[in-house]
């Protein structure tokens, strides 16, 4: 089955997947080709029959979510925005930048005149490099998506001159830094109507839910702690909110389609889980519906059967867990080379550090196979003995009374609950383990 995936820079990627593939299979293949490990920040969007933008549920089959027949057209988009310093890969940062650039040009991110000038100069630096007097005025106007006055153009040019010597990657990072401080950063907007039929925009973001007029002028802002419950019924989404008086009020939002309503319901639940929770609860992970065939099969065969099961949410990790997972993945990707450089074993050791032993991936000789097996065992041993929070220091502390031993002393001192079982930590006990450093005479990487 063929899928056409459009990147934020309008480059089209052809992705071939199995006919029964889930959305996750397609996204993983796209990110693998782009060299991106931080997959959890991204999603695949498509356009519904009524023009609504919808997120593909990565845990369900692609063919069951899309209209028509393959090839299916999808868009690679950033689903969860985080602070730029939390992004570990330059490839990930570049896709974030492309998405932000698109949002700026579309007017979805409101900024001050000073910010607009600075961002325009940085965008010029990313596209043209250092200032050149031959750069035409229309090139700057194209970047800003509007006609510029002489004063504004001169301000942008002056800022652009100051950026001489700034690399493209550095300029992109500065753009992300400026935009991440804006009020609407990371907010996903949904077009709705209220109970009286008035057009509104609902913004679902890291801190809460924004209600605006269709020109983005704010009406109300609802923080997550006062949201009791979000539910969906057909084309309607209901939000139960606690007022300052302590009473509850139910807000009704009418959507253009049932799928659009499902999209808003998903956005509220998944965004809250990603930014505000320590881990994704099983209540969110395991919520699903069944089609008629699956419902009958669950009644007469086995209620745990997967036939016809469609998951409501596809979020797997919170922002903290994504960062931790990415650090571990990057650490593991480079650990073999680092181990070989640091190892000073004698020449007869199967762990000897030699250029030939590290560059013979196609060799099937017994000694090379033994080397790779031992290196993999060493990698797993080193990872198992590292703090699960910082991934840098060795484990040397036990949480009491639960007894889990998974953190270093500095991280354990900052935790109020055990990261494994979530039970309350009464005190932390220092322990002395036979660590890999002392056993193998290696330096912790």
Swiss-Prot record:
Changing residue 389 to R: Inhibits LDLR degradation. Induction: Expression is directly activated by NR1H2 and NR1H3. Expression is not dependent of the sterol-response element-binding proteins (SREBPs). Expression is indirectly induced by LDL. Residues 431-433 are annotated as: Critical for homodimerization. Fe cation binds at residues 360, 363, 368. It catalyses: S-ubiquitinyl-[E2 ubiquitin-conjugating enzyme]-L-cysteine + [acceptor protein]-L-lysine = [E2 ubiquitin-conjugating enzyme]-L-cysteine + N(6)-ubiquitinyl-[acceptor protein]-L-lysine. It comes from Homo sapiens (Human). Its main location: cytoplasm. The keyword Cell membrane applies. The gene is MYLIP. This is E3 ubiquitin-protein ligase MYLIP. GO terms for molecular function: cytoskeletal protein binding; ubiquitin protein ligase activity; ubiquitin-protein transferase activity; zinc ion binding.
């Amino acid at each position: 089955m063929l899928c056409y995936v459009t990147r934020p820079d309008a480059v089209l990627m052809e992705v071939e997947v199995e006919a029964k593939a889930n959305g996750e299979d397609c996204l993983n293949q796209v990110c693998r080709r782009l060299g991106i490990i931080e997959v959890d920040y991204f999603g695949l969007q498509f356009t519904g029959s009524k023009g609504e933008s919808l997120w593909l549920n990565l845990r369900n089959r692609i063919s069951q979510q899309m209209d028509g027949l393959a090839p299916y057209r999808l868009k690679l988009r950033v689903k969860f925005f985080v602070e730029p310093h939390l992004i570990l890969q330059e490839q990930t940062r570049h896709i974030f930048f492309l998405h932000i650039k698109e949002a700026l040009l579309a007017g979805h991110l409101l900024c001050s005149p000073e910010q607009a000038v600075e961002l325009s100069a940085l965008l010029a630096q990313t596209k043209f490099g250092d200032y050149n007097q031959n750069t035409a005025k229309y090139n700057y106007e194209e970047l800003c998506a509007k006609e510029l006055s002489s004063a504004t153009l001169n301000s942008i040019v002056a800022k652009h001159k100051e950026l001489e010597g700034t690399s493209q990657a550095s300029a992109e990072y500065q753009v992300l830094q400026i935009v991440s401080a804006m009020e609407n950063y990371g907010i996903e907007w949904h077009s709705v109507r209220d109970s009286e039929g008035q057009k509104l925009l609902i913004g679902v973001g890291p801190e809460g839910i924004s209600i605006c007029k269709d020109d983005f002028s704010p009406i109300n802002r609802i923080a997550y702690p006062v949201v009791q419950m979000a539910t969906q019924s057909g084309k309607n989404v209901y939000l139960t909110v606690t007022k300052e008086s302590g009473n509850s009020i139910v807000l009704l939002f009418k959507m253009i389609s049932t799928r659009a309503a499902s999209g808003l319901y998903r956005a509220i639940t998944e965004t809250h889980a990603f930014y505000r929770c320590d881990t994704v609860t099983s209540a969110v992970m395991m919520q699903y519906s069944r089609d008629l065939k699956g419902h009958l099969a669950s009644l007469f065969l086995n209620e745990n059967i997967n036939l016809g099961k469609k998951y409501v949410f596809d979020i797997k990790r919170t922002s903290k867990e994504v960062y931790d997972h990415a650090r571990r993945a990057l650490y593991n990707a480079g650990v073999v080379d680092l181990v070989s450089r640091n190892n000073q074993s004698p020449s007869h050791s199967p762990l000897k550090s030699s250029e030939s032993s590290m560059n013979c991936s196609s060799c099937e000789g017994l000694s090379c196979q033994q080397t790779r097996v031992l290196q993999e065992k060493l990698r797993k041993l080193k990872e198992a003995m590292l703090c699960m929070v910082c991934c840098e220091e060795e484990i040397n502390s036990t949480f009491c009374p639960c007894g889990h031993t998974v953190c270093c002393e500095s991280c354990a001192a900052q935790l109020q609950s055990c990261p494994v079982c979530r039970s309350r930590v009464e005190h932390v006990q220092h322990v002395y383990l036979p660590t890999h450093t002392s056993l193998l005479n290696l330096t912790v990487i």
